[in-house]
Amino acid sequence: MDERPNLIHGIFLRCNGIAAPMKFCIVCGLYYLCIVQRKIIHIDMDAFFASVEQRDDPTLRGKAIAVGYDGPRGVVATASYEARRYGVHSAMAMSKAKRLCPHLIVVGGHYARYKEVSHQVRDIFADYTDLIEPLSLDEAYLDVTVNKKDIPLAVDIAKEIRQRIREELHLTASAGVSYNKFLAKIASDYRKPDGLCVIHPDRASDFIARLRIEQFWGVGPKTAERLHHIGVFTGAELRQLSEHHLQELFGKMGPILYQFARGIDHRPVVTEWQRKSVGCEHTFATDLTDPSAIATEIRRTVDELLGRQRKADFEGRTLTLKVKYADFTQITRSMSADHALTTKEQILPLAEELSRGINEGQKAIRLLGLTLSNPITTIAEPTGARWVEQWLPFEDT
């Protein structure tokens, strides 16, 4: 057998998310698999909505701006980095954002424009690979293990993509490069904004050991609090817990945390999928009993839901209200329309109708949530697709 078999370009298999090029033995005439380590890039546009507004309106550049509804119950969809220095962040009540940053400029938002720019970004991605998994309008995973330009180093592809986004679209993006999705996502957050971070396999263990537990993908405030309670604050401390112990504490989330702490994540980059739903919910520090306070929270949650819906580019026809009471009993109510629910004028009346009588008898409410589902179109998913949404119980952060 020839010890230097020729690589047959364009012929490869997908096995558990790993790109497996086929090599050919010129003596025996057989193909065989060469399993290679994956090269995953996570691209995240920097303050996307706000950056598009600043790019298109020179008077906004260098100023603290927030995209969202400028009303007493408005919610911040995205804040510029100038505004973030004052503590303003997405999902914050606009009234609070203005208190933190009195000179904040509120922009209503141009969502058709954001969608157009998002497609331009994805066109750039497509020059390098067809294995693209959009997570929202402003972020995506790319598997460049086998890429269209035969560039051997994923970091060079990430550099090219960031440069093209800057030169062609006049925006900035942060990129994370590693051998799986978990680490690539963490890496893209590590040097924001306008940053590039690579986590090499031989340095992944030390990198994870130093991470704060809050930086682990899928760990929200509630999970972090429980981990802190048992003395776990870093990746190194998480690694000391057995898989069985973590499963006892967190159910299905336990084995996932066990693997993440060791840099293991076999999820593939999935190209054909459709988000099933978009939602948000809030647990209150003090249970709600006053009808006016409940109505205020319903309106605030609608505003936040609209922001998430637009960011995810999602259109659904069914609105579901979730209510959890102080005694931990729970109800859900749903209403459907024959068209997409995409505006406040469409969603708020349904939310108010669903919430009628939910605190009958002054029953104290601990949690309120709203979810949009029943998407307009359906895209067939390959087996095992969207492992994160189907298996991993992400918390609302």
Give, region by region, the residue ranges found by the protein language model:
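DNA-contacting surface of Y-family translesion DNA polymerases
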Residues: 34, 42, 215, 223-367, ...
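Gly/Gly-Pro- and Ser/Thr-rich, intrinsically disordered tail segments characteristic of DNA damage-repair
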Residues: 9-249, 254-256, 372, 376-397
